[in-house]
Amino acid sequence: MCPASAERVSELLFNWGHGDQSAREELIPLVYVELRRIARRYLWKERPDHTLQSGALVHEAYLHLLHEEPPQWQNRAHFFGFAAQLMRHILVDHARGRLAAKRGAGAPRLALDPEIALPQKREVDLVALDDALTKLATLDPQQSRLIELRFFGGLSI
């Protein structure tokens, strides 16, 4: 993001936080590329056949952002960090729904051939990771947030 765009994004975030809905509409095209980058980074860690695509994840996060009343972003990093956290929650909810559907509602269990059932290399258990981050947050909230933003948001220190 060029310095002029970065300044404009900061200005629009401030205006949106103070009730200017047109600022929100102007902001989205300016931040969309960065939001897609964050979404791609999340999905890269997912299994290859994941049903959500980066654009759908960004759009789902955008719908959630619309319901923030009123958003008080401190700066661009705060906004992108919040969006990254929101995407993580969307993916965790999606994973939980997928796990619930996999339980089969009474269907008989079948043993799988271990050679076929090997997980893909990049597969991450988002539910277990979310539980671990939640536990870490009770011990050290700052470390939990740091790991979340680094691992999921792709942000650096």
Give the positions of each predicted feature.
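Helix-turn-helix DNA-binding module
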Residues: 153-157
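A short pre-motif secondary-structure segment
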Residues: 146-147
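Short helix-to-turn junction characteristic of helix-turn-helix DNA-binding domains
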Residues: 16, 150-151
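Arg/Lys-rich amphipathic alpha helix in sigma70-family domain 2
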Residues: 41-44, 88-107
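Σ70-family region 2.3-2.4 aromatic/basic alpha-helix that recognizes the −10 promoter
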Residues: 32-36, 55-63, 76-96
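Acidic, proline/glycine-rich intrinsically disordered inter-domain spacer in sigma factors
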Residues: 70, 111-137
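Sigma70-family region 2
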Residues: 17-18, 41-48, 60-79
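Short, charged helix-capping/linker segments at alpha-helix termini
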Residues: 3, 18-27, 37-58
